[in-house]
Amino acid sequence: MNTRCRSHVLKAWKCFSEGMNYYIASNEDQYGPWRVGAAYPFIFQPNISRTMSDKAIKFPTAPHAHFGYKIVKTFYTPYENAEQTPGFLRYPAELRSLQKMLEHWNKGLAAAEKAIECADEKKKDEARRLEALGHFIRNSTITVMNIKKWWQLNMAMQNSATAEEAEACLDKIEALAYAEIENAKDTIPLVEFDSRLGWEPSMEYVCDKWHLEWKIRQVTDGALREIAAYRKMLNLHKQD
């Protein structure tokens, strides 16, 4: 790479490295959104079915995968233990840390984009792969942050004192659902460009185009429909 391009690449890696200082991976994250990235499903937490069944869904993985779906927990909730702060207390701190990670990551992405612009033609693909890798991790970080906010809002909604208070939480939950759809869409071109992204040896592909489109369908046909149904339930209460 030429000297100008090299400086942008070094800046990108420096920002990514600094961002990793704020990386947090609790158990629910290691076995959830950090494991499958932007393909992680967003399950509306109130159980409004008449089946009384578990709301966790089986994450689709290849039948021959060594671990596959067995190490992906799709119903996001804190996994507590006696040696750590409870989830409802640590999530605000984790979100603050991840926000700092995101800020560093975005600076690194900006540098990676400049590297693409000034790279020699024969090196442009390498620069694009750097940007795609950083972009993929950035979108995964957004998913981790969004699912923590999703859990917080689902809990707050179900503990609301009034239907109006619950509906305000529901509005924010719905906005997160749409944001995650866009985040998944933004990730698709990255995994199409570099097929190494979204693959892990013990699970095979978990964040390729197919899984990202599956996640979009899950949020659209699952979470958003249940959100609409729950809104009707709140309106029934307000009519009393």
PLM regions and their residue ranges:
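Substrate-binding groove of N-acetylhexosamine-processing glycoside hydrolases
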Residues: 1-240
